[in-house]
Amino acid sequence: MSREFKRSDRVAQELQKEIAVILQREVKDPRIGMVTVSDVEVSRDLAYAKIFVTFLFDNDQDIIAQGMKGLEKAGPYIRTLLGKAMRLRILPELRFIYDQSLVEGMRMSNLVSNVIKSDQAKHKED
C-alpha cells in the first residue's frame, strides 16, 4: 500500500507555512511589502525549493521587481530561520519565483465574461 503523500509534498506544505510566517513576522525589508506564498515545490532529494509568491499590488512591474530583489536578498536569512523552525537533515536551497497564475487567471476570467456579455447582447438584438 502506497502513502497518500510523498515526503517531498509534506515538506513543501510545511515549508509554505513556515516561510509565510517568517515573511510576515521576521523579514523587515520594505521592498517586500505584502507578499503571499502561493505554492512551494521541493525537489525529490529535498535539495531545492521553488517558492512561488504573489504581491498585493501585482499590476506594477516595478513593485514586483523590487519585491523579488528583496526576497533574493533575504533568502539566506529566511533559510537560517527555517533551519531553526524545522527539523530537517537537508534544508533546501530557496529560489523565489513570481507566480503569474493568479493574474493570468483573472485576465482569462475577464475575457470569458466579456465574451459572454457580447454574446448576450447579440442575442438580445436578434
From Swiss-Prot:
Keywords: Cytoplasm, Ribosome biogenesis
Top-level taxon in the UniProt lineage: Bacteria
Main location: cytoplasm
A Pfam family this chain is assigned to: RBFA
GO BP field: maturation of SSU-rRNA
UniProt keyword Electron transport, yes or no: no
Protein name: Ribosome-binding factor A
Organism from which the protein derives: Haemophilus ducreyi (strain 35000HP / ATCC 700724)
The organism's taxonomic lineage, starting at the top: Bacteria, Pseudomonadati, Pseudomonadota, Gammaproteobacteria, Pasteurellales
